[in-house]
């Protein structure tokens, strides 16, 4: 997956969590080492996110502090994404299912290095009971309706998922301005 798309979808998930008042827990196995730091867009879009430092464990679920942070949310349904689909997303998702959690894995917000790796991982996580989704499905399911005060913020979320959607948003915004300002359309002018 191209890095800009991964970053944008991770940012969209973080913003969705913020709009829905959902807890966000982030972690990295060795952020100062070869795996690098977290994608900064995550905490930028979810300033309430809790970061849990790990001591090198590859599977986040093998870190007691991470598991405790998840349990402390009181939630039994998890939405999971990770930098590498077959590792960062799959390992903790499968482990959480084994402990009784309902887990939704956001595949297009998780990176991969090959189509084959993604297909193998999808088969593995589905067999384990993980439910695969994409970012747009997560957004739509949690948003539920456009008839809400924060609809413009949701529209911004969709521009992160579908960059071309920005054109529709701009068109809609302009149409709203025309109505609000009692302007005549060009087709209505004499």
Predicted features, each with a name:
Residues 1, 26-28, 80, 107-108:
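Short linear motifs at secondary-structure transitions and domain/linker junctions
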Residues 1-25:
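A short alpha/beta connector and helix-capping loop motif
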Residues 20, 34-190:
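Active-site-adjacent betaalpha module
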Residues 29-33:
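Short active-site-proximal "capping" loops at secondary-structure junctions
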């Amino acid at each position: 997956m191209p890095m800009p798309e991964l970053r944008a979808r991770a940012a969209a998930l973080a913003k969705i969590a913020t709009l829905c008042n959902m807890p966000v827990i982030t972690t990295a196995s060795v952020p100062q080492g070869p795996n690098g730091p977290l994608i900064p867009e995550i905490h930028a879009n979810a300033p309430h996110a809790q970061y849990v430092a790990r001591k090198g464990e590859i599977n986040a679920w093998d870190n007691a502090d991470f598991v405790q942070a998840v349990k402390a949310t009181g939630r039994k349904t998890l939405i999971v994404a990770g930098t590498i689909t077959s590792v960062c997303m799959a390992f903790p998702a499968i482990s959480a299912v084994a402990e009784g959690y309902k887990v939704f894995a956001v595949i297009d917000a998780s990176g991969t290095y090959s189509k084959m790796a993604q297909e193998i991982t999808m088969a593995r996580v589905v067999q384990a009971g993980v439910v695969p989704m994409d970012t747009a499905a997560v957004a739509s399911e949690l948003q539920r309706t456009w008839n809400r005060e924060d609809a413009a913020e949701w529209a911004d979320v969709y521009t992160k998922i579908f960059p071309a959607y920005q054109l529709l948003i701009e068109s809609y915004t302009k149409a709203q301005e025309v109505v609000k300002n009692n302007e005549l359309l060009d087709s209505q002018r004499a």
